[in-house]
Amino acid sequence: MRASLLLSVLRPAGPVAVGISLGFTLSLLSVTWVEEPCGPGPPQPGDSELPPRGNTNAARRPNSVQPGSERERPGAGAGTGESWEPRVLPYHPAQPGQATKKAVRTRYISTELGIRQKLLVAVLTSQATLPTLGVAVNRTLGHRLEHVVFLTGARGRRTPSGMAVVALGEERPIGHLHLALRHLLEQHGDDFDWFFLVPDATYTEAHGLDRLAGHLSLASATHLYLGRPQDFIGGDTTPGRYCHGGFGVLLSRTLLQQLRPHLESCRNDIVSARPDEWLGRCILDATGVGCTGDHEGMHYNYLELSPGEPVQEGDPRFRSALTAHPVRDPVHMYQLHKAFARAELDRTYQEIQELQWEIQNTSRLAADGERASAWPVGIPAPSRPASRFEVLRWDYFTEQYAFSCADGSPRCPLRGADQADVADVLGTALEELNRRYQPALQLQKQQLVNGYRRFDPARGMEYTLDLQLEALTPQGGRWPLTRRVQLLRPLSRVEILPVPYVTEASRLTVLLPLAAAERDLASGFLEAFATAALEPGDAAALTLLLLYEPRQAQRAAHSDVFAPVKAHVAELERRFPGARVPWLSVQTAAPSPLRLMDLLSKKHPLDTLFLLAGPDTVLTPDFLNRCRMHAISGWQAFFPMHFQAFHPAVAPPQGPGPPELGRDTGHFDRQAASEACFYNSDYVAARGRLVAASEQEEELLESLDVYELFLRFSNLHVLRAVEPALLQRYRAQPCSARLSEDLYHRCRQSVLEGLGSRTQLAMLLFEQEQGNST
């Protein structure tokens, strides 16, 4: 009874007692028991390396610091007796008002971390061979390797463009090489790991050299002197060999740094007739390193050309050689480059084929088996649409027609790039089929039954072809055959096209041809121009072209139809003192776009950037800047598509101001080309081609507009894109019967498409029919 009562009293205190006991136990286990001496004593000869005994035993924590006599300096050998003591740097806070000294940092983090680039190629050339062999080396090597420098003895009058040429001031071979080494050490010694010296009479295979430099490491090749080994001249019994300079020499940075203090003594003491032998003797005497042709399983392969030996593509020596020597002339250099490039291309195709086989074999081990690998191997799988609106459309075509046309017509003939694309796909399909079935069968194409193609942004252009074939056997048999073939033209590597530099600071001249019937719209255009250009001080000017009809021109002195427009222009010039808005008056009954543009072009310099606008155009700063960026002199003309609001009786009603950008409120007018951005020089060049290429200039001047002129008679890129910053309200645009047939058709098409969407027009007709039936 008493025992149970005692246990009931002690039971709440049991966990506390167990916790305290466990804590003491863990504390004792975490203590390291060591012996510390009372004081240091000088080591005696013959003493063992055991720690000296002290007269106290103390418990020390693992992260505590021992007395200075017990810790030796890091890196010092055992038994040296040198003690290491920490040096405490006192902290002195800055005095009030005293400028603190800023830490000096390097410009690039790679310099501070000591990160160096991999390879520098130094081409030893001369003033006589720099314009010939030097240029050939630069064209075959400079585009593949980033850092190539040409070291010549004396600089000529004209240095080839695009080449880094350094004149050393010494034409003699040994002196030239000596100064070249000094230049590399002084200017690039701390920037690169490897230095490759090669004469300009040697072809260098850039891909192989890049792979070699990427494989080597300074950790395992500190002193590397790599090239074609050759014995010293004169039967010298000195151990070691030198590298033949004609086939290139690869030097490590460490070896070149050790050679620096010995360059002058080598220049004065070593006598040799060949610069490469002089370099080999200098390296051997200074560092004891001789030339080697192998390192870590990699062999320095070279190709020694015989005099007059022709270059034969497919020679197996081109697959492994890094350099070829000697090269006779630039033509010989380009022939070697073609042969080496073909060998490198075959090597790349073989690697791609091996990778495809490896992917196919590995995909069989996946959970989905062979279905896990996409076709073709290495190309992303087809995109899966998230909804029915994202389904990619297949376009049907035959050998003569396409059934998906840009203008919306149901059928259009294949022309230009589309026709060449279909012919190329058919030829490739037949070639692949014959490669698979030969020599058992010889297939010939009879006709294309069905053709489908679609563009997948993740893959490229996909094709599905139903081919009617005729199979021929070696015995002479023939029978018809139908096969379905799937092909893919994959997207290649995305590249940024080099284009001339453009800026938003270019001065822009806005041109506005204004007819008398459109004079009421001039006020809104002028105010929009003032808001977008004059108020912010933008570099933009405005020129008006006032189009008078013959009767209006006769009464211009008494009742000028453009008097309100001229008054508004004068008011703008008063509001903005630095602004000048000139106008030109033209009398014409049937204004031709090209004739009007000819008149405006003659009034401005050739380097003027034009923005051709219409009275409905609402200028904004964003559109002005896009016009400057998209119009490139000698390269590109920009024709934006504005957003045209639908008829207010068809579309939902909108308030004042610019129309709302939406599918039910308007559309981008593909038929209109009233806005254009181009340079005057490009327009003059296109007009010159029109005069030279056509005998019917007068007829074309009446039937063409500026857009058609650039499309047909200019070599520029014509950029046609939607412009969300150009918003125009609906206006019943009149189509003059005096226009040419093509321009009149485009005008009528623009008017009809601007009434409303198909759905809105159908609903309007349905409501009218319902009203008539009742």
Swiss-Prot record:
Cofactor dependency: Mn(2+); Co(2+)
Parts of the chain on the Lumenal side: 35-774
Lineage: Eukaryota, Metazoa, Chordata, Craniata, Vertebrata
Gene Ontology CC terms: cytosol; Golgi apparatus; Golgi cisterna membrane; mitochondrial matrix
The keyword tRNA processing is assigned to this record: no
Family per similarity comment: Belongs to the chondroitin N-acetylgalactosaminyltransferase family.
UniProt: a divalent metal cation binding residues: 616
Name of the protein this chain belongs to: Chondroitin sulfate synthase 2
Species: Mus musculus
Catalytic activity as recorded in UniProt: 3-O-(beta-D-GlcA-(1->3)-beta-D-GalNAc-(1->4)-beta-D-GlcA-(1->3)-beta-D-Gal-(1->3)-beta-D-Gal-(1->4)-beta-D-Xyl)-L-seryl-[protein] + UDP-N-acetyl-alpha-D-galactosamine = 3-O-(beta-D-GalNAc-(1->4)-beta-D-GlcA-(1->3)-beta-D-GalNAc-(1->4)-beta-D-GlcA-(1->3)-beta-D-Gal-(1->3)-beta-D-Gal-(1->4)-beta-D-Xyl)-L-seryl-[protein] + UDP + H(+); 3-O-{beta-D-GlcA-(1->3)-[beta-D-GalNAc-(1->4)-beta-D-GlcA-(1->3)](n)-beta-D-GalNAc-(1->4)-beta-D-GlcA-(1->3)-beta-D-Gal-(1->3)-beta-D-Gal-(1->4)-beta-D-Xyl}-L-seryl-[protein] + UDP-N-acetyl-alpha-D-galactosamine = 3-O-{[beta-D-GalNAc-(1->4)-beta-D-GlcA-(1->3)](n+1)-beta-D-GalNAc-(1->4)-beta-D-GlcA-(1->3)-beta-D-Gal-(1->3)-beta-D-Gal-(1->4)-beta-D-Xyl}-L-seryl-[protein] + UDP + H(+); 3-O-(beta-D-GalNAc-(1->4)-beta-D-GlcA-(1->3)-beta-D-Gal-(1->3)-beta-D-Gal-(1->4)-beta-D-Xyl)-L-seryl-[protein] + UDP-alpha-D-glucuronate = 3-O-(beta-D-GlcA-(1->3)-beta-D-GalNAc-(1->4)-beta-D-GlcA-(1->3)-beta-D-Gal-(1->3)-beta-D-Gal-(1->4)-beta-D-Xyl)-L-seryl-[protein] + UDP + H(+); 3-O-{[beta-D-GalNAc-(1->4)-beta-D-GlcA-(1->3)](n)-beta-D-GalNAc-(1->4)-beta-D-GlcA-(1->3)-beta-D-Gal-(1->3)-beta-D-Gal-(1->4)-beta-D-Xyl}-L-seryl-[protein] + UDP-alpha-D-glucuronate = 3-O-{beta-D-GlcA-(1->3)-[beta-D-GalNAc-(1->4)-beta-D-GlcA-(1->3)](n)-beta-D-GalNAc-(1->4)-beta-D-GlcA-(1->3)-beta-D-Gal-(1->3)-beta-D-Gal-(1->4)-beta-D-Xyl}-L-seryl-[protein] + UDP + H(+)
Keywords associated with the record: Cytoplasm, Glycoprotein, Golgi apparatus, Membrane, Metal-binding, Mitochondrion, Signal-anchor, Transferase, Transmembrane, Transmembrane helix
